[in-house]
Amino acid sequence: MGKVIGIDLGTTNSCFAVLEGGKPLVIENVEGGRTTPSIVAFTKEKERLVGQLAKRQAVTNAENTIYSIKRFIGRRWEDTEQERNRVSYHCVPGRDKTVDVKCWGKQYTPQELSAMILQTLKAGAEAYLNETVTEAVITVPAYFTDAQRQATKDAGTIAGLNVMRIINEPTAAALAFGLDKQEQREQVLVYDLGGGTLDVSILQLGDGVFEVKATAGNNHLGGDDFDNVIVEWMLSEFQAQEGINLNEDKMAMQRLREAAERAKIELSTRPTTSINLPFITAFSKGGGEVGPKHLKLNLSRAKFNELSRPLVEKTIDPLKQAIEDSGLSVDQIDRILLVGGSTRIPEVQEALKKFFNGKEPDRSINPDEAVALGAAIQGGVLGQEQEVEDLLLLVVIPLSLGIETLGEVFTKVIERNTTIPTSKSQVFSTASDGQTSVEIHVLQGERAMANDNKTLGKFLLTGIPAAPRGVPQIEVSFDIDVNGILKVSAEDKGTGREQGIVIKETGGLSQQEIERMQQEAEQYADEDRKRMQRIELSNQADSLFYSHEATLKDNQGLIPQKVKATANKKKEELMAILEDPNVELGVIQTRLEDYRQAVLSMGSEVYSQGSSKSSARDYETVGEEEMTRETGNSQESNAAFSTQPEGTVNNDNLELEAVFSTYNDHTQGSDVATSSHDEIDLGDASDNSQTNFDLDDEDFNPFEDFDEEEEASTDDYEAVE
């Protein structure tokens, strides 16, 4: 088994890490960032962008830039109205009344879109580790339902990952904080306020055991909500000043969202911030004239605290519930761990400090990275890394599970905060005489009545022999695995007839759908690879264009007209096919190689003409003995130039040396620019580039193709001698 990576698939940003030498290490993405925006975009050219690239173009492509998709994964259409009204992209009903996203005429499930983000993280891990990555541990909010967990696992499968474990984000964070403190027995509260969710978990750490005592949270409260209060304030202020409502302007709304996020971040360290958005909209002056409108506002931390106070107060309720469920008091909590970027908000920190009677939270680990680090540790456990074999993680379910019984009552089978994996059964019977079938309505929640809890699924057990009510014995079994995936079965003890269901209906995908999405994901990966190959070839062409022009400029009189004409023709052919987006890569490689050979021929002529002139000049001005000495110097210079092509050895070769030094400098520049794509197979073009211009090769000789000219020149010298 290779390395198991840990992935924090966040609402606004994602992070991935791996265990190296017993220590978790965050992996930087290809752009050098330690977190990757959880954003996917589709351009009008049908190009797919992920991460920072997608975020940069969000303002100009708001309707086709998908963010916060985690808020929709595994959820029903009717449960997401508030979230749907906040996004700029087009949401449509999906299968099983879930939420899909429509871009350029095609529908995407949240699983597919999440898989695109996971694919990007997977590629980054493979580039860092220099090996194929197939296993992962993915984190989810503690309050994620079974359907949301299953949908997240499906996303990993679509991305080509074997999701070995789905673990709760607060639990993962506790692993990151507690790795070096395993011998200390502590009661730890993890407060995880991310981009879209709030999770609170209380764990007992010690002796290598991480036991979750209680968990609570809010799946609809996070950093996005703090951004939204700033957006609403800006909308209100702008309408008051200008009388213009920006709500229907999607481009303006996207700019407001980005400005709100920046303002929120700045107010974590500054007392006030300025929000300047020039040309936010246009207005009619009358007579057909249109003029611009600018938004310029100042927001103080005090005002932000006032706007966000209701949100901060909402974060306290899960704290109270978790404390109560754990059976502990506030004073018995030894440590408070802050996780998630939104915990940087000063008002949130003050509220926590007040709730815990002045106890300072632990900020020793970057809150953006703690969850991914913990997931990497769990990955090390599952991957049997020796350094962490003694860790044991005991996770609990956040909400009770049960079925609907007579009178629409919710009867619990597994109580909340039960450690998983677990399996429990209860025996039920029929509610009326002669009843031959029963519907098993599986629910999740804490309310007494079935209608007040969340439906997970329904199935029918038929073929029950007719009997008086209360006589048939029907055993209902609940089985939850380590990932929190629930299986429910019902068996008639009299006949042995059994029926069951794996709870995955909310956003669940069939195996065929998952396979189809995997194929599409692979197709996109192939398209991405081809696009990078094309960019690499284009970069090589640009280097050749520059070298071509430099050689002509510095050595105009040394190159025959026929050779120049050939090189110019090859250049025009290459430029023409580079303009065609549909041309095959093989054609580009062929034209590039033809042009490269033409440029090399120019260099050959420069070398040949330069050597001839040098020989004639030396013969005229120096005696026979002096000519022999110059011949020796020329041979010595060539030998030195083979191993140190950029060094200056002989003044006679200085001009020639400068020409090829310029060429090689720019070829190297192209290699540096594409060094992050070492895995790309560029075929012959790449091979030729290495053959001709690998300056790190000790045997490198830029003139090895011109041995005949060198030998001829040397023979001439010997003849003179």
Curated annotation (Swiss-Prot):
Tell me the function of this protein: Acts as a chaperone.
Does Lyase show up as a keyword for this record?
no
State the family named in the UniProt similarity comment for this chain.
Answer: Belongs to the heat shock protein 70 family.
Task: List the keywords (alphabetical).
Answer: ATP-binding, Chaperone, Nucleotide-binding, Phosphoprotein, Stress response
Q: Which residues carry this modification: Phosphothreonine?
A: 197
User: Protein name, please?
Assistant: Chaperone protein DnaK
What induces the gene encoding this protein? By stress conditions e.g. heat shock and by hyperosmotic environments.
> What are the boundaries of the region Disordered?
606-649, 667-721
- Species this protein is from: Aphanothece halophytica
**Superkingdom of this protein's organism:** Bacteria
Q: Which molecular function terms from Gene Ontology are attached? A: ATP binding; ATP-dependent protein folding chaperone; unfolded protein binding
Annotated signal sequence range = none
Locate the transmembrane regions by residue number: none
